[in-house]
């Protein structure tokens, strides 16, 4: 087994999905958010630079507006996300403050990173915030993003957004928290003998084909989007860990080299024992 080496990792992007922030009841998982804030603050205190890509605006909005289902109308979806984004950032700010960590909000659309001038501006914003010891919290700007063929400004989901942010900021590692343990050789909800892949060095067509499927009730990203994100990370010569977000403290164990989740790193860059 390849040994994971994260001693030289300084800049980390952590992506947390809606399914990790919102309980099956639709209520906000306050305990999970508190644990995440503790872990990120602990990493910051150790000299790490952390960027958080957080889904959840829709889930927060549904909770606040006491709506049981995600609206099908685009304008209503944008309205619910807009309400939820404010609530989510307010909660993040309060909980991170408990650990004496300051946070900021960056809302992105795809066109911001496509055009060189706006890309340079957002890159400078990230660097300035990081230099001030602030944790940038990133989400897609759902209230204004569109997915029209002639002017598509959506990333698709926050799995891909996190890979884009990792590329923009030249992060050493992307940690993707999800409601699954990692990438399996086949669907673990169907096959009892499914095996977790500890390390993926090459994303094959077989892996892509087996990664189909939708996201959670409150989110949009499925396994395919996570594989596509890993491909983007590979293109930027980076590395990614896909792991279960049930216990955010496991992030610390991963950074110690423990083999949790699936580690995506190209084989030519892997050091052997």
Swiss-Prot record:
Localisation per UniProt entry: Cytoplasm
E.C. numbers: 2.7.2.11
Catalysed reactions listed for this entry: L-glutamate + ATP = L-glutamyl 5-phosphate + ADP
Pathway(s) annotated for this protein in UniProt: Amino-acid biosynthesis; L-proline biosynthesis; L-glutamate 5-semialdehyde from L-glutamate: step 1/2
Leader peptide range in chain numbering: none
Keywords from the named record: Amino-acid biosynthesis, ATP-binding, Cytoplasm, Kinase, Nucleotide-binding, Proline biosynthesis, Transferase
InterPro entries: AceGlu_kinase-like_sf (IPR036393), Asp/Glu/Uridylate_kinase (IPR001048), G5K_ProB (IPR041739), Glu/AcGlu_kinase (IPR001057), Glu_5kinase (IPR011529), Glu_5kinase/COase_Synthase (IPR005715), Glutamate_5-kinase_CS (IPR019797)
GO MF annotation list: ATP binding; glutamate 5-kinase activity
GO cellular component: cytosol
Residues engaged in binding ATP: 15, 178-179, 220-226
Highest taxon of source: Bacteria
Role noted for this protein: Catalyzes the transfer of a phosphate group to glutamate to form L-glutamate 5-phosphate.
HAMAP family per UniProt: ProB
Family statement drawn from the similarity comment of this UniProt entry: Belongs to the glutamate 5-kinase family.
Listed name of the protein: Glutamate 5-kinase
Species assigned in the record: Streptococcus pyogenes serotype M4 (strain MGAS10750)
Gene that this polypeptide is encoded by: proB
């Amino acid at each position: 087994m390849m040994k994971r080496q994260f001693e030289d990792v300084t800049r980390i992007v952590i992506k947390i999905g809606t399914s990790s922030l919102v309980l099956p009841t639709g209520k906000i998982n306050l305990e999970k958010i508190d644990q995440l804030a503790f872990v990120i603050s602990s990493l910051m205190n150790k000299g790490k630079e952390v960027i958080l890509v957080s889904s959840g605006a829709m889930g927060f909005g549904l909770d606040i507006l006491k709506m049981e289902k995600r609206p099908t109308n685009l304008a209503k979806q944008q309205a619910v996300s807009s309400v939820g984004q404010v609530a989510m950032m307010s909660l993040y700010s309060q909980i991170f403050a408990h650990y004496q960590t300051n946070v900021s909000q960056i809302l992105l659309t795809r066109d911001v990173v496509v055009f060189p001038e706006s890309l340079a501006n957002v890159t400078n914003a990230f660097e300035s915030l990081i230099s001030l010891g602030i944790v940038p919290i990133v989400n897609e700007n759902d209230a204004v993003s569109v997915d029209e063929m002639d002017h598509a400004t959506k990333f698709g989901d926050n799995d891909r957004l996190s890979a884009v942010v990792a590329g923009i900021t030249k992060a050493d590692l992307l940690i993707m928290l999800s409601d699954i343990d990692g990438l399996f050789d086949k669907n673990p909800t169907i096959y009892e003998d499914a095996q977790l892949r500890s390390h993926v060095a090459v994303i094959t067509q077989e892996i892509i084909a087996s990664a189909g499927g939708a996201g959670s009730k409150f989110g949009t990203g499925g396994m395919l989007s996570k594989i596509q994100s890993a491909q983007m990370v590979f293109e930027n010569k980076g590395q990614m860990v896909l792991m279960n977000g049930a216990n955010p403290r496991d992030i610390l164990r991963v950074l110690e080299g423990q083999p949790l989740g699936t580690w995506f790193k190209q084989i030519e860059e892997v050091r052997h024992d």
